[in-house]
Amino acid sequence: MNTGVQYYRAPFPEMEYWEQDFKNIRNAGLNTVQLWVLWGWVESTPGKFDFSDYDRLVELAEKNNLQVVLSSIAEIQPMWIHREVPGSEMIDRFGKKVISTIRHECNFGLTPGGCTDNPGVQERMKLFLESCAKHYVDCPNLHGWDLWNELRWNIQADELVCFCPHTIEEFRNFLKQRYGSLDGLNEAWKRRYIDWQDVMPGKAPDRPYSEMMAWQDFITYRANAHGAWRYSVMRNIDKVHTMTAHGASPSIGYSGDQQTYPIDRGNDWELAKGMDGIGCSSFPVWFNIDDAEFGSRIEMVNAAANGKHIWLSELQGGRAGIGFDLTGEVSPEQQQRWLWNGIACGADTILFWCWRDEVFGRESGNFGLYGNDEYSAERIKAMSESGKIISENSSLIDNYKPDSAQVGILFSPDSYYLAWAQEGSALKMQKAIDGYARALVKHSIASTFIESEHLENLDRFKFIILPRVVALGKEAEEKLLSFVENGGTLLVESECAAFDKAGLYRYPEKRFLNRLGIREAGRRQLITPVEFTIGGKTLSLGCDQWLTPFAIGENAPAEVFARYKNEILAARYSCGKGSVIALGSYFGNSYLETENSDFEQMMYSFAAEAKVERTFEMLTNDFIYVKSGSSEGRQMLFCFFPDSEKVCRLRLNRADFNGSYTDILSGNIIKADNGFLEFKSLHRNLAVLVENK
């Protein structure tokens, strides 16, 4: 288990602090430092690579028994890039050259720089990456590489990019690969193009969906390919060390805005396939991320990693702030929750941002774990305590795996692309996913995330949820139909897969659910809340956007949950060996706004009906976040207590279990009574229980 801090973003901190800082970092219980190796800094003169400051830092790290993560920051380009590669500027959607500048939080180097589809820029970048790998491949304390920081490539472009001739040519090549020919494209898009030169990217939202969705899809593909390219360049030289990349958030959380497309930084599922793992940044106080959301966030990364390395590549070190605005302080209790939650979710490398407060630009005076705020000394003390516990239990933690989930929540990039093509944001789609994930966490029902182009091994699930999945491809539809017919339970919301991958609307009789005898009757005006009856209980549920009741057809519902006037609004349908729960509106979005306990109860009932097996059932009144897993044949329970609840009571699914657990944080021993556990937190509102053998 590697726990560490980001330390150096050249040229800060200055050399006078290095030696003592590295001693303090090791004394704080941390074992790793991360260094930003900036292309613009290292190759400030074309063809001359100066690693002297990094060499000194790597040497000091080894002296203090610290491992090193090197972040190859190729996206901060040299100031000379446009002189050496004329015409390499990115082009925005209005045909204007993008003027690159020094980035707002980095002291030297251009952003966004030259377009990486330009062969000249790519060749220069390759030389930098190769130089980094050759220089440090034999470094004895090198832990690994973070190949692409927050997957950034269009920061400070100030507009949607890139529309340069190289990128547009690659876009057309992408379409040729997908559709085979112009005739194939015309058939899919219902067009009459006669020349590929006429096929252009989508320019703006609220225009025809087909080219806008295809362009966004290409931009994601392009980022995936660039990440794989960076990996191949480095892997050709360094055959040993772990190489990952990380986004500012998981790809599910990247819904786009006026200057960015959704998922334009790449799709974590594809990025992880092309590397040794994947990671993400998390600043919980800054962005008001609580235990439940943090756990879901890291599970998104875990799901995409698919058994590969999971890195918490930037975890909030100290108080955040931008410019003259401050956010809340980071207490040691909060920070330790994130650390142990990350471990509970399967992370094997956790790096805090950063050691000292920043000193440049908008981030000045903030973010330091060892920063100048009132909690700094307490954070260091708490980190030292945890570092000792992690070291003493290193084998246990290194071999830990979270429990597998039997509930899958579907992420459909096509639905994100469709939403952005209309509204310039896919936030509604993101919030729908977040809503269902949160409701399941609140009932301690383990869930994970599946991506619509990576639907392998669906038989591991008993229950799959499609939150606001309005666009879907045929291959995904076929796999979901097989899942239901083979005994799975599928939950769908309004107008599920109403649009195809080209953004063309399909009438209800043309949608894949019609093959199961489930057909919507059309859109109705929104009325909210809606009254449900489930298991003899009446529930009041908020919904969103519109109502789409279901027509009465060949497949009569096995159970009706809600009606709109005389029409069926929500029902369960028997389909083959499985079933479909069809909801005629968007309920996850409404839940995320209100956290209505009736929605949580509905999801609890649906999971139980689907025979989802649970490791434990929580018996306390207030929500206690618990994550379960195992290591070396022993069950582990990570428990995160709120201030309002001092005692955790839960029932294991091992009714006859009368063994015991040790809380490795406090040393407390807890005895089970026929599968029932009751215990308190004796350490910072946390408990990490390990089954005794």
Where are each of the predicted segments found?
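The substrate-binding groove and active-site-proximal loops of carbohydrate-active enzymes
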Residues: 3-14, 36-52, 106-126, 151, ...
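Conserved, mostly hydrophobic/aromatic
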Residues: 5, 25, 33, 61, ...
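Short, acidic/polar
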Residues: 12-27, 125-131, 257-271, 331-339, ...
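Aromatic-lined substrate-binding rim segments of carbohydrate-active enzymes
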Residues: 18-27, 31-101, 130-133, 224, ...
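Polysaccharide-binding and catalytic clefts of secreted carbohydrate-active enzymes
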Residues: 92-294, 300
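Hydrophobic targeting/anchoring helices
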Residues: 246-435, 522-527, 534, 540-542, ...
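A short, well-structured beta->alpha microelement
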Residues: 437-457
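A conserved amphipathic helix/loop scaffold
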Residues: 459, 467-693
